[in-house]
Each structure stands twice: as structure tokens, then as C-alpha cells.
Regions:
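Helix-loop-helix hairpin linking two adjacent transmembrane segments in secondary transporters
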Residues: 138, 146-191
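Extracytoplasmic gate region of multi-pass secondary transporters
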Residues: 36-40, 216-273, 336, 366-367
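C-terminal transmembrane helical hairpin of 12-TM major facilitator-type secondary transporters
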Residues: 286-338
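Cytoplasmic helix-loop-helix junction between adjacent transmembrane helices
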Residues: 113-150
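Paired small-residue
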Residues: 97, 108-116, 315-323
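Flexible cytoplasmic inter-helical loops of multi-pass small-molecule transporters
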Residues: 188-210, 406-415
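Conserved MFS/SLC helix-loop-helix module at the cytosolic interface between two early adjacent transmembrane helices
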Residues: 69-108, 283-286
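Structural signature of the two symmetry-related core transmembrane helices
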Residues: 85-99, 290-305, 384
Length: 423
């Protein structure tokens, strides 16, 4: 082990401006993710869909995203193509694929559009994390947390739009597509890499192997998989749970009830934006592994408790939904930061895309688990199965902390310590 080198804090005067630009772009770009899910009740009536088929409106996006991230990883595109260009082109494609939902379509065509949307979003999410990491080192946890928080609010936005009277399929879908197109312009015109760029390299078949062979990366991804097992299933089915609970409580169908359910669904997801900022701030001070453990334990507990609010007073449902929505995403950005710290700099883009690819592959399973479980045991226990994810996630993160010897930062939030390896 060589000498310890202490780097100066992040000081570039444009870093916060760039963070704001990327956060806005990520919010706008990711708004197409749940565009179909937000209007699923109307689509279900149009195509006579079963609960499982409704779930595929989200699962198909996950499938496209997995294929897209796998392609980026195998071809090393995240480390070869400039992130700005990759983001802009991908966001524009996502906008077009999503807008196609307003055409006279069949359910099969809609699924194809959702797969294409997810495929394109593979060029929006991971590159944004890499881009902001070129502007921050000492406060990278907070910066990446802001990006993940922004995309969380973006994914919730279709539910907010749908909460307004008269906002049917066409307004929700087209507003989301316009937002994604705007994101493409913002990044394409306004973004440049920061003072801490990651090394680029030519294509190499062995780069994925370099990433996967790193044990810290595998443990970080193990924790991430536990987190993802719970996250997207919660986001997909919590709005359905809320609507069913409100109906069971006796609220009559109508515009007011629709506004309540969609407004609460938006809030339960969007509160994650604040959670990601909180998580980044805490992680930079108490340690990433500490924050992840606390968030996983809290979210897993919420997944068990929320079922007991079914059919009860709306304020109780709202309280537990907001708590779950907060903790289920609070740690998400920190897994990405752990990944950027676990591989050589020239492999960061590929490491992030492989991480997200396997994570979203797992979400396809957990999303489809809930409908059959709900039919068997009802909403009271349906979400409890998701607590399995946090249990395994905590185990992986504790092993990572033991491996790295790091349970909390050894320095303040404005200092970065780099240990030089002997050659």
C-alpha cells in the first residue's frame, strides 16, 4: 500500500449549476417510465386487461431497459461514446417511442412501444450518474443522490398529471414525451464533462470481465439487487394498492376519488426525491454502508406493515405509503456511488450499466410476483414478500463494509482520501 493522498474539496464554480441542469434533465427524461402505468385503468378498460397484463405495462419497460443496458455494457458504449451525446439521442428516442402510445394501437403494439422506451432509457439513466461524477468527488454521494432523486420525481410525474380532471391517456403520454424531448435538448446543448473525467478506452471484450471479477463490485451489486427486488414492485403496485384501499374504505368512484388516489400515488413516489438528497447527505457523513443498512431495514419493515392499513382511514394509508416511498429509494444512489468506487476509472461506465442491467432484470420477477400473491393472501400480506430483498441486501452490504474496513467516512465531507496501490 502506497502513501495516502488527500485531495482538495470540490471547488469548480459551475458544479452546482451543472448538477441543477442534469437533475432537471433527468427528471424530464425519466417521466416516460410510468406514463402507461399511470393511465393503466383506462388502458385496462380499452383492452380488457388482467392484473398480470397491467403489470406488463411496467415490466416491458424493465425488459427493454435490461436489453439496452446489456447492449451498452457488452459493447462498452458507456465508456466509448460521449455521455452527452448518448443521453441526448436516447432521450429523444424514448420520447418518440412513448408518444406512439397515443396512436390507435393494440395491447401488443403498446408493449412493443414500452420495450422500446425502456431500451432507450438505458442511455439516459446510467450515463447521467457517470456525468455528474465528473463534477464531484468529495460530495459525490450527495450529487448522485440528487440525480436519483430527480429521476424519482420524474417517474412519479405522470401520476401528478393524471390527478388533474380530464387528464386521460393522451395528455399524460404526450406531456411525458415532450418532457423527455426537452431533456435531450438540455443535455445536448448545455452539458460538458467536469474536471474529474473518467478515462476513456477503446472497445474491449474483457471490460465486463474486469468489472465482474472485482469482489467489492459484486458485493455492492448484491446489496443493489436486494434493494431493486423491493423498489420497482413497490412503485408499480403501490398505486393499485392505494386505489383498492380507498375503494374498500368506502369512497365512491368519481373525479374526487381519482384525484386522491393519483395524488397520493404521486406523493408516495415523489417523496423519494427528498429521500435521495437526505440519503446522499447522510452517506457522505456517516458512511454509505451505514445509510444503506438503515434504509433497507426501514423499507423492509414498511413493506410488511403497509398491508395492515388496507381499507383503513386514508390518512393512515398515506402515512405508511409516504414512509415506504421515502425509505425504499433513500439508499439507491449510494449503490451507484459504491460501484464507481469499486472498479478502475476506465470501467466506471460499464460497471454502472452492468449493475443496472442485472438489477432491472430482477425487477421483472418481483413485479410479476405481487398479483398472484395478492390473489392468494390479499393486500394485507401481499407486499410482505418484498422484505426478502432488504434482508439479503443488508447481508451483502455488511460483508462489503467488512471487506473494505469502512463503516463511516474517515474524513469530513469536503475531503477525499485516495489510497495509491503499489504497482
Amino acid at each position: 500500500m502506497g502513501p495516502i493522498v488527500t485531495e482538495s474539496p470540490d471547488t469548480h464554480p459551475r458544479r452546482w449549476q451543472v448538477l441543477a441542469l442534469l437533475a432537471v434533465a433527468e427528471l424530464l427524461g425519466m417521466s416516460v417510465w410510468f406514463a402507461a402505468s399511470a393511465v393503466a385503468p383506462q388502458l385496462a378498460v380499452r383492452w380488457s386487461l388482467s392484473p398480470s397484463e397491467i403489470g406488463w405495462l411496467t415490466t416491458s419497460v424493465q425488459l427493454g431497459f435490461v436489453v439496452g443496458t446489456a447492449a451498452l455494457a457488452i459493447l462498452n458504449l458507456a465508456d466509448i461514446v460521449p455521455s452527452r451525446a448518448l443521453f441526448a439521442v436516447a432521450a429523444l428516442i424514448a420520447a418518440c417511442a412513448n408518444a406512439a402510445l397515443v396512436l390507435p394501437t393494440t395491447y401488443g403494439f403498446a408493449l412493443a412501444c414500452r420495450i422500446a422506451t425502456g431500451f432507450a432509457l438505458a442511455g439516459v439513466y446510467p450515463p447521467a450518474m457517470k456525468m455528474i461524477a465528473t463534477w464531484f468527488r468529495a460530495r459525490r454521494g450527495l450529487a448522485v443522490g440528487a440525480i436519483v432523486g430527480a429521476l424519482t420525481v420524474g417517474k412519479a410525474t405522470p401520476y401528478l398529471v393524471h390527478a388533474f380532471p380530464g387528464a386521460g391517456v393522451r395528455p399524460v403520454v404526450l406531456i411525458a414525451s415532450a418532457a423527455a424531448a426537452t431533456a435531450a435538448v438540455l443535455v445536448g446543448v448545455g452539458y460538458r464533462d467536469g474536471p474529474y473525467p473518467f478515462a476513456s478506452r477503446r472497445f474491449s471484450w474483457g471490460l465486463v470481465g474486469t468489472v465482474v471479477s472485482a469482489r467489492p463490485w459484486r458485493l455492492a451489486v448484491g446489496g443493489y439487487l436486494g434493494h431493486m427486488f423491493e423498489l420497482y414492485s413497490a412503485w408499480t403496485w403501490l398505486p393499485v394498492f392505494v386505489a383498492a384501499s380507498v375503494a374498500a374504505h368506502g369512497l365512491p368512484p368519481g373525479p374526487r376519488t381519482t384525484a386522491i388516489t393519483n395524488g397520493l400515488s404521486f406523493a408516495a413516489i415523489a417523496v423519494g426525491g427528498v429521500a435521495c438528497l437526505w440519503g446522499g447527505w447522510i452517506a457522505d457523513r456517516r458512511g454509505r454502508e451505514w445509510l444503506v443498512t438503515v434504509a433497507l431495514a426501514a423499507s423492509g419493515t414498511c413493506s410488511i406493515l403497509i398491508g395492515f392499513s388496507f381499507g383503513k382511514a386514508t390518512w393512515l394509508v398515506a402515512t405508511l405509503a409516504l414512509l415506504w416511498g421515502f425509505f425504499v429509494i433513500a439508499d439507491s444512489a449510494q449503490f451507484s456511488v459504491l460501484v464507481t468506487e469499486s472498479v478502475p476509472s476506465h470501467a466506471v461506465g460499464t460497471a454502472l450499466t452492468v449493475q443496472t442491467s442485472v438489477g432491472f432484470l430482477l425487477t421483472m420477477v418481483s413485479i410479476q410476483l405481487i398479483p398472484p400473491i395478492e390473489r392468494l393472501v390479499g393486500w394485507r400480506w401481499a407486499f410482505s414478500v418484498l422484505a426478502i430483498g432488504p434482508v439479503f441486501g443488508i447481508a451483502a452490504v455488511r460483508r462489503l463494509a467488512a471487506l473494505t474496513g469502512r463503516t463511516r467516512p474517515s474524513t469530513g465531507p469536503d475531503t477525499v482520501v485516495v489510497r495509491e496501490r503499489t504497482r
